[in-house]
């Protein structure tokens, strides 16, 4: 079982021509749906409102095969993100979070997740920012079994991060237990403002405690860099006509984690860069299909079989 923890929200997608569309979203939410669509055993841990938006969020999780027993229902209104698309389909985000559903995840909500002793735990995005959710998920990371693979998708959101110094400190603490880290070049610039990209990648790929850690660094349509300690592999992304980039990184990370768990891989296998690269290649195919559609609409397992 994979547990994905963090926010579920509504993306209000604003197109360059002025059209607006309300779409289910949130990095962890998209990740859970992707794994479910690919056929993985996955549960979502997070707060979901009882309002109409929340009902839609819950229904889509269920439709995609995501277990709901760790979902915490609340009367708080659904958290909202406004995603403004430019002419290339790239999205920039603003968030409306005060008094809404996602941030209020409390420490009492993680007992069920710990009882599962999951094979993998995935977290990131606003789950590293919004309180008390961020403190709760940091505690969860510190308490999962040693056998649980922890994957963190940094997915930094500067516009939702009032205290960048405190945020960086929390991320560093969480990454100390992380086995797989997905970052973008924008994330690296935000986490390490005083370092160039290569130095930042080296810093995040080489934990002070030693051990094996895989870093997957994305850069939009440019090649993905797979880093395991000092080893590097550059992976070209599949060519695709982009409709929009909403959910692209989530789809990539979910595809990687699904492939890793499906293949019976463990934390120890992260030393094998060829294995990490193979899972990243699968993730890039998942992301390529996602960006060819409007909104965060990841592919199903049957679609991945075409051209495999």
Locations of regions flagged by a protein language model:
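Cofactor-binding loop segments of dinucleotide-utilizing enzymes, especially the Rossmann-like FAD-
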Residues: 7, 46-50, 155
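Ribokinase/PfkB-type carbohydrate-kinase core domain
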Residues: 1-3, 60-62, 68, 87-232, ...
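Active-site metal-binding loops of divalent metal-dependent hydrolases
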Residues: 8, 27, 126, 154, ...
């Amino acid at each position: 079982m994979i547990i994905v923890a963090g926010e579920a929200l509504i993306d209000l997608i604003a197109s360059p021509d002025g059209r607006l569309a309300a779409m289910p979203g949130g990095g962890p939410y998209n990740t859970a749906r992707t794994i479910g669509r690919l056929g993985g055993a996955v549960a979502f841990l997070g707060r979901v409102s009882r309002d109409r938006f929340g009902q839609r969020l819950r229904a889509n999780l269920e439709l995609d095969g995501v277990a709901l027993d760790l979902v915490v229902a609340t009367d708080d209104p659904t958290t909202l993100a406004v995603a403004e698309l430019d002419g290339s389909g790239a999205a920039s985000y603003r968030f409306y979070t005060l008094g809404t559903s996602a941030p209020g995840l409390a420490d009492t909500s993680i007992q069920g997740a710990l009882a599962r002793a999951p094979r993998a735990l995935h977290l990131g995005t606003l789950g590293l920012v919004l309180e008390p959710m961020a403190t709760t998920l940091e505690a969860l990371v510190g308490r999962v079994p040693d056998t649980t693979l922890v994957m963190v998708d940094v997915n930094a959101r500067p516009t939702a991060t009032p205290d960048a110094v405190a945020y960086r400190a929390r991320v560093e603490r969480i990454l100390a237990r992380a086995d797989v880290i997905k970052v973008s070049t924008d994330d690296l610039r935000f986490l390490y403002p005083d370092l160039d990209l290569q130095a930042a990648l080296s810093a995040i790929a080489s934990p002070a405690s030693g051990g094996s850690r895989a870093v997957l660094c994305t850069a939009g349509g440019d090649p993905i860099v797979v880093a395991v300690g000092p080893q590097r592999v550059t992976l070209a992304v599949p060519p695709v006509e982009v409709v929009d980039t909403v959910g692209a990184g989530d789809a990539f990370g979910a595809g990687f984690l699904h492939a890793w768990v499906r293949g019976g891989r463990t934390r120890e296998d992260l030393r094998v860069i060829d294995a990490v690269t193979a899972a990243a290649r699968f993730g890039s195919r998942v992301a390529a299909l996602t960006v060819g559609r409007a909104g965060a609409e990841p592919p199903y397992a049957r679609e991945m079989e075409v051209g495999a």
